UniProtKB/Swiss-Prot annotation:
Catalytic activity, as annotated: a quinone + NADH + 5 H(+)(in) = a quinol + NAD(+) + 4 H(+)(out)
Annotated source species: Edwardsiella ictaluri (strain 93-146)
Cell location: Cell inner membrane
Stretch list, region NADH dehydrogenase I subunit D: 213-598
Region (NADH dehydrogenase I subunit C) residue spans: 1-189
Gene field: nuoC
Keyword field contains Cell membrane: yes
InterPro entries, A to Z: NADH_DH_suC, NADH_DH_suCD, NADH_Q_OxRdtase_suD, NADH_quin_OxRdtase_su_C/D-like, NADH_UbQ_OxRdtase_30kDa_su, NADH_UbQ_OxRdtase_49kDa_CS, NDH1_su_D/H, NiFe-Hase_large
Short name of one Pfam family: Complex1_49kDa
UniProt-recorded name of the protein: NADH-quinone oxidoreductase subunit C/D
EC numbers on record: 7.1.1.-
Cited SUPFAM superfamilies: HydB/Nqo4-like, Nqo5-like
Amino acid sequence: MTDSTTHDREMSAWQTHDHLDDPVIGELRNRFGPEAFSVQPTRTGMPVVWVKREQLLEVMAFLRQLPKPYVMLFDLHGMDERLRTHRQGLPAADFSVFYHLISIDRNRDIMLKVALAEQDLHLPTVTRLFPNANWYERETFDLFGITFDGHPHLTRLLMPRTWQGHPLRKDYPARATEFDPFELTRQKQDLEMESLKFRPEEWGMQRGTANEDFMFLNLGPNHPSSHGAFRIVLQLDGEDIVDCVPDIGYHHRGAEKMGERQSWHSYIPYTDRIEYLGGCVNEMPYVLAVEKLAGIEVPERVKVIRVMLSELFRINSHLLYISTFIQDVGAMTPVFFAFTDRQKIYDIVEAVTGFRMHPAWFRIGGVAHDLPKGWDRLLREFLEWMPKRLDSYVKAALHNSILKGRSIGVAAYGAKDALAWGTTGAGLRATGIAFDVRKWRPYSGYENFEFEVPTASNGDCYDRVMLKVEEIRQSLRILQQCLKNMPEGPFKADHPLTTPPPKERTLQHIDTLINHFLQVSWGPVMPANESFQMVEATKGINSYYLTSDGGTMSYRTRIRTPSYAHLQQIPSVIRGCLVSDLIVYLGSIDFVMSDVDR
């Protein structure tokens, strides 16, 4: 880490702030003048700057060229502003598009916003500055109907090509009951099948050269090595991959749209299913972002409990990843060993939360209930068991010469490429950048734990899988500290917006009982504002960007997932490799399609 973010961390997480003291605001004013843009106070923890459409490319290029540049486009998406009532001080807009940039050198973020009128939904593409903007712009076009001029291939991404309408617009229905009954006729079926045909010319690909013809191969969407409903079309010259086109969206469920029709509390179970292996890790950024809106500071016991559950799920996910990677390379046995170890984790999770994969256990202001008797014994037994088992995975499989031969030097990329494609997690740390949100931007008390951030230097498949092994060791260190230093105290915050409030108080205070009734029946009312929270999830950085319009439901829920960025990177990495290398590369990414498609 370079420039400290101590100032930001000392501020109350829920304090509305315009961040005018951030150095980048001064740099922008010096370059473009004080009247060139407006700054929006939010609870996102970063400067939010509205710029004119005509200045967008120039401003983004300027941020990339600063002495400590903003080198990563972390996120890009839109918002339908037409029904938003709390817009005081903001530029007039029917729609808006935001660009979230990260500077690794500064350890700081900035968000740029552009206001758009409904009759003129056009923006210049930023793909020439940030190549990973490609999918984000396609998705924004798909879900909002905003056109990005100059985009190399502006087509739908998550929805089928035959889809009518743009689902994240406010005038688009949110429930199936608002649509006419669906009927799949033979004609519709033929139309859908025709739309799935791959035409190389649409993607700028040649069918052949003067000397040879290329073969086009569909890998997926139901191939065992594609790790879910994921299709990737390969342009092949024999076994060599000339180019490829990833095709996503088969697992899309409209998770962000669902956030607009669920209360702040009732949306928690949906967060578990964004990345279905991460469990409570997925709940963390959502509840932290909501707590920023509400102004809730949770007790120390809650922070440590949340960290404990998150690290258990991190180990659980990493074990599945390591074993399936080994399986993709050709060894079967480790998968069965891993499921034995994962069962021990599920026993702890079930004892604590009552559920296994999808606990939906974190609450706004705390957790659902206190730790049960005997939780410490279960955790202690696991901590005694797991280190030796982890050593056996390394010795028996990961040090195997065949596995090394299939993965060392395969699908390698450097730090510059990783940042350009928005790569996070082990994929970024394998290139030598030790960016881990738990260390660089601690949340939920991670600053009180001692652990290391493992890194590597080759950026290949083998580095990525070995980093996950080391991350498990660090998670075990964190769990040891949770076991030894679990604070006493309540498991929920004493705050009016804690949902649901502590039950014992509802039996003693009529005000709390009324509050409980309103929160359960209608949902808590959050102050109008915007908040943001990123966490180090199992597969990289996961974040929630929430917009409240002062109601019981989110006005806009934006979910940024790591797997989405990692799959977009595939063509740039795998060109010139063999098909067999692609299988190993896919296994090394660590993704699930629910995390990609949401």
